[in-house]
Amino acid sequence: MIFAANLKCNHTRASFKIYAEILNKTMGAKCDDIIVFPPSVAFLENENNFMQGAQNFYPCVNGAFTGELGKEHLDEFGIKCVLIGHSERRALGDEELIKVKFNFAKEHGYKIIFCIGENLDTKNSGKTLEFLKKQLEIIDLNYEKLIIAYEPIYSIGTGVSAQTADIAKVLEFLASLTKVPLLYGGSVNENNIKEILSVNHCGGVLIGSAALKVENFIKLIKG
């Protein structure tokens, strides 16, 4: 199972160092199925027992791109995993860059967690599967380092996860399109994680607020 934590705009370099130390000690040995996405200012240079990922990046090595992170910066911290397509990035106008980002990350051999998800209007209109398929049309579903995370927008940060039957329907559909690992994200917590992980084709979870405290993240990993 893959356990990924998106810390979003939380944690400082100092607090994430403590987070990492506790997680490293608890894990004991390296495991690339445990992935943590800290804010870029909190990236750690030292080796960790988990995989450190980037929440965002710009598809360049370096250059005149004010305020952006290029491959050169990710390389300095040994970053080999990137998050692409999160709804909070799409809402900020990232949509047009998604295909370019994916192709750049693929070209340079990054592990990619590619996020897809529909809003409540799309769900209620019965067009979820059609919408998700369209989101996936711009990427290579056969890329060997691809992971797809289904995160319904109406569940992100709301405390209300999607219904298990809905998750199962979507993951079944996605499994018919690709053989890559499939994750669920959207208000994953200690009360629902076991049920979510029991869904057919679910290969793990992408966790947000429930992973902000390392002790909580460890509980979720241990089940």
From Swiss-Prot:
PROSITE patterns per the UniProt record, alphabetical: TIM_1, TIM_2
An example molecular function term from Gene Ontology annotations: triose-phosphate isomerase activity
Record key words, sorted: Cytoplasm, Gluconeogenesis, Glycolysis, Isomerase
Biological or metabolic pathway of the protein: Carbohydrate biosynthesis; gluconeogenesis; Carbohydrate degradation; glycolysis; D-glyceraldehyde 3-phosphate from glycerone phosphate: step 1/1
Primary localization: cytoplasm
Entry keyword annotation includes Cytoplasm: yes
Transmembrane stretches, start-end: none
A UniProt-annotated Pfam family: TIM
E.C. numbers: 5.3.1.1
Keyword DNA-binding (UniProt): no
GO cellular component: cytosol
Reaction catalyzed: D-glyceraldehyde 3-phosphate = dihydroxyacetone phosphate
Superkingdom of origin organism: Bacteria
NCBIfam families the UniProt entry points to: PRK00042.3-2
Record family assignment: Belongs to the triosephosphate isomerase family.
Complexes and interactors: Homodimer.
Function text: Involved in the gluconeogenesis. Catalyzes stereospecifically the conversion of dihydroxyacetone phosphate (DHAP) to D-glyceraldehyde-3-phosphate (G3P).
Protein name, as recorded: Triosephosphate isomerase
Organism encoding this protein: Campylobacter jejuni subsp. doylei (strain ATCC BAA-1458 / RM4099 / 269.97)
